[in-house]
UniProtKB/Swiss-Prot annotation:
The gene is psbN. GO terms for cellular component: chloroplast thylakoid membrane. This is Protein PsbN. May play a role in photosystem I and II biogenesis. It comes from Draba nemorosa (Woodland whitlowgrass). The chain crosses the membrane at residues 7-29. Pfam families: PsbN (PF02468). The keyword Transmembrane applies. GO terms for biological process: photosynthesis.
Amino acid sequence: METATLVAIFLSGLLVSFTGYALYTAFGQPSQQLRDPFEEHGD
């Protein structure tokens, strides 16, 4: 394969991995530990 193809595949995989990790952090098991500043506000 050409270098440009390998770089494109690597960057695409990196983007997909980062997106998956962000979704897991937002909606998965670790999301229970996140605080919600809107619920903490008393108004």
